[in-house]
């Protein structure tokens, strides 16, 4: 795939700081302007239906944390873990997984708007609402190099598939 990544994509996140390292510490959400921050970089966006959910917590995101050095060695400048959860939940999720690197970002896709626009959202029962699907995207210099959505498991959106696609 060689499509241009959409312009004007903005997520919300809370930047990790040592002063706010405690999982209960609340930072202030700020915009993550994809165009501005990642224009000439290689970024992996890995989306999850929800922070602290079984597959996301046990099988999907921990391998990205464990293989972050390998991702950087393969040319990745940043990893963005994306969900429709609010930025406070995303921040706590990153802290719970022990992530402290500023290039490993836990961001919110409010209302799953970006994911919906890309055809990568899920409509779950009313108690859960619209969520981001489980997917991975590799964007390099503003061009989408890889997109894979999983309906079950993490075969296409997991770290091994992402590393193989780099």
Curated annotation (Swiss-Prot):
Any one Gene Ontology molecular-function term assigned to this protein's record: thioredoxin peroxidase activity
Active-site feature positions: 56 (cysteine sulfenic acid (-soh) intermediate)
InterPro entries in UniProt: PRX5-like, Redoxin, Thioredoxin-like_sf, Thioredoxin_domain
Reactions mediated catalytically: a hydroperoxide + [protein]-dithiol = [protein]-disulfide + an alcohol + H2O
E.C. no: 1.11.1.-
Keyword Oxidoreductase applies: yes
Pfam families recorded: Redoxin
Keywords of the record: Antioxidant, Disulfide bond, Oxidoreductase, Peroxidase, Redox-active center
Gene3D superfamilies in alphabetical order: Glutaredoxin (3.40.30.10)
GO cellular component: mitochondrion; peroxisome
Every Thioredoxin domain range: 5-166
Gene Ontology BP, a term: cellular response to oxidative stress
Comment field (misc): The active site is a conserved redox-active cysteine residue, the peroxidatic cysteine (C(P)), which makes the nucleophilic attack on the peroxide substrate. The peroxide oxidizes the C(P)-SH to cysteine sulfenic acid (C(P)-SOH), which then reacts with another cysteine residue, the resolving cysteine (C(R)), to form a disulfide bridge. The disulfide is subsequently reduced by an appropriate electron donor to complete the catalytic cycle. In this typical 2-Cys Prx, C(R) is provided by the other dimeric subunit to form an intersubunit disulfide.
Self-association state and partner proteins as the record states: Homodimer; disulfide-linked, upon oxidation.
Function in brief: Thiol-specific peroxidase that catalyzes the reduction of hydrogen peroxide and organic hydroperoxides to water and alcohols, respectively. Plays a role in cell protection against oxidative stress by detoxifying peroxides and as sensor of hydrogen peroxide-mediated signaling events.
Protein name: Putative peroxisomal peroxiredoxin
Species the sequence originates in: Lipomyces kononenkoae (Yeast)
Source organism phylogeny: Eukaryota, Fungi, Dikarya, Ascomycota, Saccharomycotina
């Amino acid at each position: 795939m060689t499509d241009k990544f959409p312009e004007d994509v903005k997520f919300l996140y809370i930047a990790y700081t040592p002063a706010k390292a405690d999982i209960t510490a609340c930072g202030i959400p700020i915009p993550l302007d994809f165009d501005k921050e990642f224009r000439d970089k290689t970024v992996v966006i890995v989306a999850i239906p929800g922070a602290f959910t079984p597959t996301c917590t046990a099988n999907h995101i921990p391998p990205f944390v464990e293989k972050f050095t390998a991702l950087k060695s393969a040319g990745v400048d940043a990893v963005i873990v994306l969900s429709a959860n609010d930025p406070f939940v995303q921040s706590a999720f990153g802290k719970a997984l022990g992530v402290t690197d500023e290039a490993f970002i836990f961001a919110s896709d409010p209302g799953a708007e970006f994911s919906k626009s890309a055809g990568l959202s899920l409509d779950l029962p009313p108690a859960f609402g619209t969520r981001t699907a489980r997917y991975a995207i590799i964007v390099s210099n503003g061009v989408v190099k890889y997109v894979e959505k999983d309906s079950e498991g993490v075969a296409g959106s997991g770290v091994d598939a992402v590393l193989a696609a780099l």
